Every structure is written in structure tokens, then in C-alpha cells.
Design a protein with these regions (language model features):
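Phosphate/NTP-binding elements of NTP-utilizing enzymes
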Residues: 1-230
């Protein structure tokens, strides 16, 4: 809890705002509106900022992921700003939760304060060449490998070739396995289907998509049509 603050200015947003105020980065009306929205979050005591999650995401990306050509990934400042918006804002809700007695017989309802992530959707309205696909890759890869629950993710685009621009850097990162996590996840052989599961590769690119076999999580490509996405 000591890292949470309902008054702190987010690190990467603060750097961006200072550059805008100095006149180094011109912004349009839409970006100005988003900056006003973030300033309102900073002022509102109901919303809390935690600096730790985005730093973990940055370390994961820069130690594990690669570009499509296999070169090391170094996150752009814009990525850090976008990631901070996704991972660092929280609010609390009070819920009545059933708590059993220590003996296992009976129980009672208690009111607990539950921490919830504020940002569940993010829209990036930026021009061509802003590396949106690579940012998408970094979010997908982080959630599939760091989240220990079973997840099912979908990436979609107007054409399958465009959708593959998200998957391709991820597959390259798995092939290179430059960081300690991917080295561990790619130990063993994908062809070892008869021996113990511990001897198999745990993070694999298959015909389904990219699978994390430790958590049974999947990232797949789907065509951009209503019937396929539903």
C-alpha cells in the first residue's frame, strides 16, 4: 500500500507534460483533452497511482522481447507513457465477502476493500509508423507470461498479414529466448510429446497461435468479422 498515492504525478506522464509545457512537443486538441483527463485523475482522491507495475513491464520487454528482425527491444518513451496509463491506475471498492470460520463449519460476511485496475480498455489514435503493432505485442506477451491465471487473448486486423505483424516479433523473441524467463520457458523440445511434460517446451508457437503450456494460456489471430470475433 505504501507505493500507492492519490496525489502523485505519474513518472512518464510528468516528463511528457513538462516537455509539452516547455514547447518541445506540440500537441493537438485530442491529446490536450487526454492530458486534462489525466490531470483530473491526479487531483481526484478516489484514484490511486502505483509506479511499480509499469517498471516491471518495461523490464520484461527490454530483457525478453525482440523486434521482428531479432534485435533487442528498447521501449520508446511513448510506449512507457501508454503502458503507465494501462498498468498504474487503481481504485477501491467495498464488497461483502463470505468468510468461513477457522473450523470449516459456517461463516459470516465481512466487508473488504478490493483494489481494482481503472483502465480496462485503451484506444490509440495515432498515425502510421508509431509502432502500434509492436506495443500490442508487448502487452500480449506480458499478459500471457506474467499473469499466472489462464488467459485467452485475441489479436485481429483487417487482413491476416496485418495481424501477423503483432505475432511475428513475439515468435522471434521465443526463438531467440534472450532473457531468463524465455530461456526457461523454451527449455526442452516441442517434439517431445511422449515423455514427462517438464521436458517439453512450455512457450510455443503452434497452429492455434502462441501457447503458454504452464498456464494453458493462448494468444490467437482471428479475422476481423463479427461472426468470427463473437
Amino acid at each position: 500500500m505504501r507505493h500507492l498515492s492519490n496525489t502523485a504525478t505519474p513518472k512518464y506522464y510528468g516528463l511528457f507534460r513538462d516537455a509539452v509545457m516547455r514547447g518541445e512537443i506540440p500537441v493537438c486538441k485530442k491529446v490536450s483533452m487526454e492530458m486534462n483527463r489525466i490531470d483530473n485523475l491526479i487531483r481526484d482522491p478516489r484514484y490511486y497511482y502505483d509506479p511499480r507495475p509499469v517498471e516491471g513491464w518495461i523490464k520484461f520487454c527490454e530483457s525478453e522481447l525482440t523486434l521482428t528482425d531479432g534485435s533487442d527491444m528498447h521501449l520508446l518513451d511513448s510506449f512507457k507513457l501508454w503502458g503507465e496509463q494501462v498498468f498504474c491506475w487503481y481504485y477501491f471498492v467495498e464488497r461483502s465477502v463470505w468468510e468461513p470460520y477457522p473450523g470449516g463449519h459456517g461463516g459470516h460476511y465481512v466487508t473488504k476493500r478490493i483494489k481494482k485496475r481503472l483502465t480496462n480498455k485503451q484506444y490509440l489514435i495515432v498515425g502510421r509508423g508509431a509502432s502500434k503493432s509492436l506495443y500490442d505485442t508487448s502487452i500480449h506477451a506480458y499478459e500471457e507470461n506474467v499473469d499466472t491465471s489462464t488467459t485467452h487473448q485475441i489479436t485481429t486486423a483487417p487482413t491476416m498479414k496485418l495481424a501477423d505483424e503483432v505475432m511475428s516479433p513475439y515468435r522471434t523473441a521465443i526463438a531467440r529466448a534472450r532473457g531468463p524467463l524465455f530461456k526457461f520457458m523454451t527449455m526442452g523440445s516441442i517434439h517431445n510429446t511422449t515423455g514427462p511434460r517438464s521436458n517439453r517446451q512450455q512457450l510455443v508457437s503452434t497452429k492455434k497461435g502462441i501457447e503458454n503450456l504452464l498456464t494453458n494460456s493462448l494468444l490467437e489471430v482471428r479475422p476481423m468479422s463479427i461472426d468470427k470475433l463473437q
